[in-house]
């Protein structure tokens, strides 16, 4: 059992999630001021002593225009804690920024996810907690421990309680998500189908091919994130054109950037379900949210007490 106390700090990216984690742990959020000067430089002040404490900084990767500002907030907060002589700094990043830039997929392309890992370590981070990394190998970019939590247990609970899964089929919108969907199918004893998509450029899918029979069935379309929603909407159209009864999209990270709102309004999706790893303010009837703050809070508690977090890979806290 650790003798130093938990200190929770939060940037401006997701105050709602930070408050839920605080309530779950019974630990108040520490006083933090994050401001921008007129020239847009970020300034941070920590309003209480954190010397020799176990500090957790909650800041998610989010925002069409603010994502880089939020990243700078996180780095400056980490550095401020480091210079304040804390015992350990854990960055809690539910949605890891730049996670899709994880490999050199064309000439002269940067591996930006590796750069983010370097920046976090250089700032003084000792540990990272995140959820459903777009590419799990990003953990290997770090020289510090990374706990990549899974949204799967919470998704399983939602499917079991909020859908007629006995008369449904799971669908992966691309080959990369097949492993994720196969894991859910095994646990739910369900069949699954696969959509192969061909991209000509980023965020734009040109053609989709369905592998599997979805005629007359409810389709649960599973993915790790919904950004512009082009993939999900085209996948939904493909499924409906092949005779699907309805399509429910279930994702971990509901980014919903660009024209996502308009696409969802005009789509044939019956429902889109996401967690609250990032703020969602679409105000659409078809959008439903799953709260993952209990999982993150329990991971913080276990890490602070020196307990294993592997239980959370297969179970959602009650």
Curated annotation (Swiss-Prot):
Family affiliation: Belongs to the ribose-phosphate pyrophosphokinase family.
Any Pfam family the entry gives: Pribosyltran_N
GO cellular component, as recorded: cytoplasm; ribose phosphate diphosphokinase complex
Gene: PRS2
Sequence positions that bind Mg(2+): 132, 134, 143, 147
Molecular function via GO: ATP binding; kinase activity; magnesium ion binding; ribose phosphate diphosphokinase activity
Miscellaneous note of the record: Present with 8120 molecules/cell in log phase SD medium.
Keyword Transferase in annotation: yes
PANTHER family, per the entry: RIBOSE-PHOSPHATE DIPHOSPHOKINASE FAMILY MEMBER (PTHR10210), RIBOSE-PHOSPHATE PYROPHOSPHOKINASE 2 (PTHR10210:SF32)
Protein's cellular compartments: Cytoplasm
EC id: 2.7.6.1
Protein name listed in UniProt: Ribose-phosphate pyrophosphokinase 2
Domain of life: Eukaryota
First-level EC class: transferase
Chain's role: 5-phosphoribose 1-diphosphate synthase involved in nucleotide, histidine, and tryptophan biosynthesis. Active in heteromultimeric complexes with other 5-phosphoribose 1-diphosphate synthases (PRS2, PRS3, PRS4 and PRS5).
Entries under InterPro entries matching the protein: PRib_PP_synth_CS, Pribosyltran_N, PRibTrfase_dom, PRTase-like, Rib-P_diPkinase
PROSITE patterns in the record: PRPP_SYNTHASE
UniProt pathway: Metabolic intermediate biosynthesis; 5-phospho-alpha-D-ribose 1-diphosphate biosynthesis; 5-phospho-alpha-D-ribose 1-diphosphate from D-ribose 5-phosphate (route I): step 1/1
Keywords: ATP-binding, Cytoplasm, Kinase, Magnesium, Metal-binding, Nucleotide biosynthesis, Nucleotide-binding, Transferase
Gene3D superfamilies the UniProt entry points to: 3.40.50.2020
